Amino acid sequence: MSRFKLIKKTKAGIRLGSIKTKRGVVKTPFFMPDATRGFIKLVSGHDLKKIKMGPMVINTYHLFLQPKMEMIKKAGGAHKFMSWDNPLLSDSGGFQVFSLVHRNPEMGKIHENGVKFRSPIDGAWHDITPEKSIQIQFDLGVDMMVCFDDCPPNDYSKEKIKEAVLRTISWAERCKVEYGKQIKKRKIKESERPLLFGVIQGGVEFDLRELCTKELVKIGFDGYGFGAMPVDAEGNFLGEILEFTANLIPEGSLRFALGIGSPSDIVKCARYGWDMFDCVIPTREGRHGRLFLRKRNYKFQIPNSKEFYETINIGNSKFAADFKPINPDSKIPELREYSKAYLHHLFKLKEPLGARLASMNNLEFYLELMEKIRKSS
């Protein structure tokens, strides 16, 4: 039985729906910040609860290496370890493992059974297989999990990308089998089982994206993710291939645009029919003093939504004497009460409070953006 309900498709192409998870219902489309290692830098769980943050993404690879699974299991799972009550999605860690190995072959080797790699933390060697990745994600106790996949750079030859596609399909099948075994072993009810996502690889090749999607759909998953970087080797956004891939995924399945992205890219992809997004952009940009701000008195409209916001660099000298609030419309008291001049001062002194406030501003902006997308017609 599907846990995703597609309620309506708007004239702009936005898919309005809902997902039932063990920890509540989530409206789609939605954005998840990356709490990669079990936290968002400089932002506490209480900060996140204040802005009503929903699901977040954690990373299997990073948590497996530190604090290691024994510690998380002892804590009672990732939710208890993090003191987080809302849904969590675990990324399989495939992107991180393969980035490590592709950048430096001395750090590991890909084989048909999985990947052997050296920990960049302590130099210890580890083997991750599709089965082990699923077992770890069940131990994390997440609400949504992602199959282990082979994630090559987009500038690889078509032949090498095809090898990764075929390996990804094979591993997805093994992940699905192990997923079934874990459900049975742990006696998990249908209403409480974590959702499982297959990952569509294929680089910039349309035919390989199509091949991968069709084979994954035959295996059958709750949702399907767009794998690898959403830009080509020159940094151009892969809008055409993202739209093409979204249309290959069954209407009744969730569509997860992994690693996307900027506010304007999220709007584009929501129009293409993607339901879920995650990225480090709001918090990473915030830590570097770049803030997303809604233009006041501007009505948000999907076709020209890029004009709905501006990005400012609070470190610029023009903000040194700007005593207007950081964001007068924010629900966060500090953002309404502190001035841009004060935030500029904090960044000049490298005071962590500045990065925290900027990160909170951007997270709130993203949540409001998704709400406006859901309410647009």
Residue ranges: model-predicted function:
Residues 1-189, 317-320, 348:
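Non-catalytic, usually N-terminal nucleic-acid engagement modules in DNA/RNA processing proteins
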Residues 182, 195-297, 307-326:
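Glycine-rich phosphate/ribose-binding loops and adjacent secondary-structure elements
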Residues 377:
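Histidine-centered catalytic/metal-binding microenvironments
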Residues 13, 184, 299-303, 307:
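Charged/polar low-complexity intrinsically disordered segments
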Residues 280-296, 307-374:
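Gly/Ser/Thr/Ala-enriched C-terminal appendages of enzymes
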Residues 153-158, 162, 223-230, 352-355:
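Glycine- and acidic
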